[in-house]
């Protein structure tokens, strides 16, 4: 039988006191899912209607709640997960939930209905609660627990007005459940939004969870690691992102907002295998002694304190480095530069006419102009030129309709964004249709992008367009300009001259689309000062005198 529910004594309640538990539908989903996991469920089904404000339901096949404990379920600080300990000292938490506030908060903010039955119990109990009013009755139900929270904040109009749109809340809920799938991959998961299945996962290992959340192509590019205290997967070096949003960590089964030290430990393990400024995909489950971490420092319990963070970070770094060392890691060769296409010269930019002097380290151009020495980052400059060229060409031709629409795998998060911004994407030639079951159909592509020498072009375009950036058009152009741009080791004098010519025609030649500078300028006076010389020649004015 399940552990009975009891009300915590005041000294324990003070230890676990937290801020507001339920401030949005996402909080309800998280708290109910944690309860299902703590109950040992092997199947968890979540239904969300109206962005969660109309209804959130979580159904599990876990241990259930004994009939005699059901009336206490919506009481504040009533829980089966902690017992009264010493009146001083810290708590040792071994479950995801422990405060006994989730059901109480849900009943205060909306209408709560709970139906539950332990497997060994004859008949189920049903509880309805709204505010402090509680009603319990007998019913029939399968083993497990179903919790429904409806009309959230209906009695709190001020709070209701501050809620995000239904689409935005659904996007965050799907992202949250994706993290639970990644760290609890051995369970059956199902998310339904307004009657439409959004996420379905059958029991699998970490690689299978990556396939569910990020698609089979990503799953095929991850390496498995299993060391004492650290288990999971990390991506091969070719699967990287500019952001760290696909670096996932859990401590004792709890998905957490990782401290920077853990993210840095993973990145450091790649050493020179990882391009600067990029991050890998990783899903890492960390195991520590319960007394060595504290989840009670934030209402959402997603920020935890680790007693020996440096030691944990070192263990993570060694585990990731070991996984990478055990596999051959080969990179694909990038595309080459093409001469700039002729077009009317822009009126803005004011980039000087530079004379190429030489190439340094097959990446930097040394040039002179206006009496000064210029150092040009060829990759950033080429990236800027490609970005502006793609931007000019994007609206000049009708979208290219694919002969056969391509099916692509979408994450639940991407599916939610597709529903938000599908019309905006069609406005500049990108037509993506939701095909159901985590798939999307790519029907048209902007003609300017169709012939770019970018591996997995369609996948890259769709992934970037449905990322979290505020301007999907700009994000797509910036990424497609970066991928084929010149890399270190590809530069020679001929390509350097083409880069300078292309940069001179840019409207904004001074930075790449990601904000990095394209050029550095050194005057002769700067050089003379650095070398301790007392004067310089006024070459810029055509005089050879020392000033």
Swiss-Prot record:
Key words of the record: DNA damage, DNA repair
GO cellular component, one term: mismatch repair complex
GO biological process: mismatch repair
Domain of life: Bacteria
One GO MF term attached to the UniProt entry: mismatched DNA binding
Family membership: Belongs to the DNA mismatch repair MutL/HexB family.
Function noted in UniProt: This protein is involved in the repair of mismatches in DNA. It is required for dam-dependent methyl-directed DNA mismatch repair. May act as a 'molecular matchmaker', a protein that promotes the formation of a stable complex between two or more DNA-binding proteins in an ATP-dependent manner without itself being part of a final effector complex.
Name of the protein this chain belongs to: DNA mismatch repair protein MutL
Annotated organism of origin: Deinococcus radiodurans (strain ATCC 13939 / DSM 20539 / JCM 16871 / CCUG 27074 / LMG 4051 / NBRC 15346 / NCIMB 9279 / VKM B-1422 / R1)
């Amino acid at each position: 039988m399940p552990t009975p529910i009891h009300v915590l004594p005041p000294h324990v309640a003070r230890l676990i006191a937290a801020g507001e538990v339920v401030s949005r539908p996402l909080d309800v989903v998280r708290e109910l899912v944690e309860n299902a996991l703590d109950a040992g469920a092997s199947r968890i089904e979540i239904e969300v209607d109206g962005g969660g404000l109309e209804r959130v339901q979580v159904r599990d096949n876990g241990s259930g709640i004994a009939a005699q404990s059901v009336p206490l379920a919506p009481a504040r600080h009533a829980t089966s997960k902690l017992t009264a300990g010493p009146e001083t000292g810290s708590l040792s938490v071994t479950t995801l939930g422990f405060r006994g506030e989730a059901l109480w908060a849900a009943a205060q903010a909306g209408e709560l209905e709970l139906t539950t039955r332990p497997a060994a119990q004859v008949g189920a109990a049903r509880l309805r609660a709204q505010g402090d009013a509680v009603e319990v009755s007998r019913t029939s139900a399968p083993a497990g627990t179903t919790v429904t929270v409806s009309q959230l904040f209906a009695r709190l109009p001020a709070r209701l007005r501050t809620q995000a749109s239904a689409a935005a809340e659904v996007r965050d809920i799907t992202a949250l459940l994706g993290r639970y799938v990644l760290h609890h991959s051995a369970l059956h998961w199902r998310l339904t939004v307004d009657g439409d299945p959004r996420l379905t996962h059958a029991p699998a290992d970490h690689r299978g969870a990556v396939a569910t959340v990020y698609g089979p192509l990503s799953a095929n590019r991850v390496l498995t690691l299993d060391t004492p205290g650290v288990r999971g997967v990390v991506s091969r070096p070719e699967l990287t992102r500019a952001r760290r949003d696909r670096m996932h960590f859990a401590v004792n089964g709890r998905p957490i907002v990782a401290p920077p030290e853990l993210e840095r430990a993973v990145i450091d393990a790649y050493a020179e295998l990882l391009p600067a400024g990029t991050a890998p995909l990783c899903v890492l489950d960390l195991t520590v002694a319960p007394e060595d971490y504290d989840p009670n420092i934030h209402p959402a319990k997603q920020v935890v304190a680790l007693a020996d963070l440096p030691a944990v970070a070192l263990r993570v770094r060694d585990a990731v480095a070991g996984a990478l060392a055990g596999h051959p890691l080969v990179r694909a060769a990038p595309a080459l530069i093409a001469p700039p296409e002729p077009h009317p010269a822009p009126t803005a930019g004011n980039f000087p006419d530079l004379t190429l002097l030489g190439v340094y380290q097959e990446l930097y151009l040394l040039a002179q102009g206006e009496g000064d020495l210029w150092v040009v980052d060829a990759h950033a400059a080429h990236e800027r030129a490609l970005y502006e060229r793609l931007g000019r060409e994007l609206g000049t031709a009708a979208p290219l309709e694919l002969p056969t629409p391509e099916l692509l795998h979408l994450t639940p998060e991407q599916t939610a964004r597709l529903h938000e911004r599908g019309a905006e994407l069609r406005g500049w030639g990108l037509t993506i249709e939701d095909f159901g079951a985590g798939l999307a159909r790519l029907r048209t592509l902007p003609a300017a992008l169709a012939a770019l020498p970018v591996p997995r072009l369609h996948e890259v375009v769709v992934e970037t367009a449905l990322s979290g950036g505020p301007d999907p058009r700009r994000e797509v152009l910036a990424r497609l300009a970066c991928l084929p741009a010149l890399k270190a080791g590809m530069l020679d004098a001929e390509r350097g001259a083409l880069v300078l010519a292309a940069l001179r025609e840019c409207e904004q030649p001074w930075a790449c689309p990601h904000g990095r500078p394209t050029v550095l300028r050194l005057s002769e006076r700067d050089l003379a000062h650095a070398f301790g010389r007392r004067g310089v020649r006024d070459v810029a004015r055509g005089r050879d005198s020392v000033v």
